[in-house]
Each structure stands twice: as structure tokens, then as C-alpha cells.
């Protein structure tokens, strides 16, 4: 529902009307948010119809919308890679393609272990389908013994499927071998790739190779490491 409000605000601020179509999971919330925004717009002297909401969970509505040449100026798909590519492939109206999120969390050797576990758990489990959910966890080798055993148990208790390199597999018999394709995959689900790295430089190189420039995270108590990560990683 926050995307409904964000999208409407951005469109109005840029001088555009907007047609909103949200997912079925948040249909009622989206409908309410859109109605409130339309009412507020009208109160500010903007036509209420400048903000419209498609009140159906039928996917055919999306197919109809992306073929309304002459009526719809541009479509902006927001969501997982599957939705985005389906719109890009099938639309006859112009599309602004949003990026997929292969997002990483790097647990540095100087991280607070308890904090790192909370962050790494939330980043994967809270909302695994969103584009800024973590897809790969990178762990410095010097903190792996303190961090990984408990972290893997936490993931297992929440039915997270773990794919890891050989070093990670030594910590649990429930870790599946990771593939080259896994590193660049946006799972959008309770599945996670895990890698142990020798240094922050290796972590940043991995992110540069497989990341999509979306959302990246470092967990550390080392100010210099945090600054290096912040100013190096896209």
C-alpha cells in the first residue's frame, strides 16, 4: 500500500494523472489509500479523477491496460522480476522498466553478532517477495564461526532454503550447493544464497559482479569499513 501512495504522489507532483493497479494481497488497503488521496486532491482543487484505482484482482485488467495506446502514455511496473518482464514483453504502450533487486547483506568481521543476526533475519524473512529483500548473505571468514551456526538455525526455523558455497555447507547439512546462476537470481521467496568471504574487498567485488545496484547493506562497528563500503558499492 505504501507504493500506492508513493506512486500517486510522484505522478501528481510531476503534473500527471495516474491509474493505480495493486496486488490482490493488499486490495482493500490500496482501495482505501487511493480513495483518500483522490478526496484530498479534490479538496486541493485537483480533479478527483486524476487519481484512479482499478478495483479488481483480475490479471486481465493489466493486459488490457498495457495495450491502451492513445489513452495510457506510459506504464511503470513495480514488483518482482516476473511481473516486470511480463509487462516489458507484452505491452504495446511505452514502458519504464524498473530494476530487479539482487540485494546483499555483508556481515563484516567487526560486526556485532546479535545485531547482524537480527538484520540478516529481517532482511530475508519479513517480506521476501519485495524487490529490496536480501537475496545473498556475505559473511567475513573471521566472524563465520560466531555468526553462521545460529543464523542458519534461525533461517531453518522459518523454512528458509539456504544455498551456500562449500565453506557454508560445513556449518549445516541442510545447506544446498549454490550455483553460479543463484548468485544473480532474485528469488523473491524464502530462499537465500550464502557465501563466506576473505575480506571486505572480496564482498564488494562479489556485489559489483552480481548485484543490480538496488539496495546493499554492511553490518559493522568499524567506521572505516562502513565508509569504504558506502563510497565503493553501487
Which role does the model predict for each range below?
Residues 65-74, 89:
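Active-site/ligand-binding-proximal alpha/beta "capping" segment
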Residues 52-69:
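A structured beta-alpha segment of the ubiquitous adenosine-cofactor-binding alpha/beta core
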Residues 179-234:
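Conserved C-terminal structural/oligomerization subdomain of aldehyde/semialdehyde dehydrogenase
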